[in-house]
Amino acid sequence: MSIQLQKTMQRHRGLFTTDHRTIGIRYLLLSLLAVAIGTVLSLFMRIHIVSPDLKLPLFGQIPPEGYLALVTMHGTLMVFFVLTTAPVNGFASLILPSQIGAQRMALPLLNAVSFWLTSLSLTVLLAAFFVPGGAPISGWTNYPPLSAIAVAGPGQATGMDLWLVSIGIFCFASILSAINMLTTIVSKRCEGMTLLRMPLTVWSWLVTGVLILFAFSILFAAVVLLLSDRHLATGFFVPTGEVINGLLLDRANSHANGSPMLWLHLFWFFGHPEVYIAVLPSMGLTSSLLANFTRRPVFGYRFMVATTLFIGVFGLLVWGHHMFVSGMNPYAGTAFSLMTMAIAIPSSGKVLGWLAMLLRGRDSRVHPMPTPMLFTFGFLSFFIAGGLTGPILAQPILDAYLHNTYFVVAHFHLIMAMAGAFSLFAAVYYWFPLMTGRLMHETLGKWHFWLSLIGAYATFFPMHFAGLAGQPRHYAQLIGSTSTFLSSLLPLQTGITHSALFLASAQLLFLANLAWSARRGKPAGSNPWRATTLEWASDLTQCRVVRGPYEYNFQSNLSDFVMQCAAEPEQE
């Protein structure tokens, strides 16, 4: 066999590898690409809002329909390919097997197939920018009938089809990934790793996997039905006699007796669990990192497990609070409101548990505070700030005014986008040694944290005031004869735009830190954070777990911690 052929075969083995760590890193790089594109799109949106006549380099002046296309693609990229792909597919592939003492995922080929399908999904989505008409303009929720009729506007023909195909592929890939994740947790735990010895990150991935099976199956079905309406003239979502751009849709046996409400129910049955699919892994990571850096056991481990399960169950039951103004039965609105208030109870319990860990560990926590701990504080801050507006939007009478305003944009960007992003940063800084064998630069990391924290609050907190003033989201501009009542908000929106540019610029520090640390970072050693969970164990080939995952403040003159697989405390 020639040397060239050997190199080619090695290259293909690497390309189509089933190694879980390699696939996990590839997922994270895919998410990094998606977040870079999504961030650029959001900056174009912000610039257009305050300067609609500005001609951007390479893009020219963005028309109103172009702004709506940016909204659609930004939301889709961030929700699906960043906040779902990175914490679930990426870090679960990278870390999950090691945390339960397994050598690999239960279904490694399925893991690889899921990654390549996700990559295909992203490619199909981005292709929508380059087809006639461009990307769809109906928002990342794509409500019918606007999304069901090709003549409804620019981007609603081929671009809309590509969006639906992309999301269908993504749903299928996510379901495969969830099956693999759940099978791994159930069948690959090492000796002694009982359910109540699993780290809380594993519990969060377990519940997240179940949510994915339910939520993405429903979204996949909804996508198929919408494609059927568009190309087979079925009538699932388009009412009889609908007029779109002057065209009466009254053809015989087509688009008869459909209802956009059906799409709302199907989409939001996926959409609200998606919030917890994005946030639950962050909750598990927060508990683990707080225990690690305060050098104290998790406060109420069983309670934390119970709240995770409670959130998973109730996360499937509260989708209707997105539909208070849709015309659904008011009694149903009351029921959804009560259940939404109820789901705040376990979330509040988690916050109280985290605060108790900080209080108990105030004398024993690591000094100086490492970067992963800072970003964990950031997650906690955004989760509380965004969560406080949740009960407001859960009231039908208040939501009637605030629905579809910037108040909602501020709410979900704080509790989902910023909380999720800061948790992802914490995870990267914490687990970077497992990927490269090196530590990330602490000074750059701290600058990255503080600039990002300031930029995030300066960007999203003022949006609450824009929403309270009545500004709807998705408006392409604030000036002109149609926007007279919004012109007074232009200074506020200008400040938000400047803050968004500042926040995006701060992320260059993170990219620089990644590039520098991967090559020249300080060697990490086998367990740089002196952690107790198995991903930091030096050998998992004959691993046997003999204790829980958070044995810190261990009463010994040798060490203040003991790993799950260690019979005695480790020598320092």
Features from the language model and the residues they span:
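Membrane-embedded and interfacial regions of multi-pass energy-transducing membrane proteins
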Residues: S2-E572
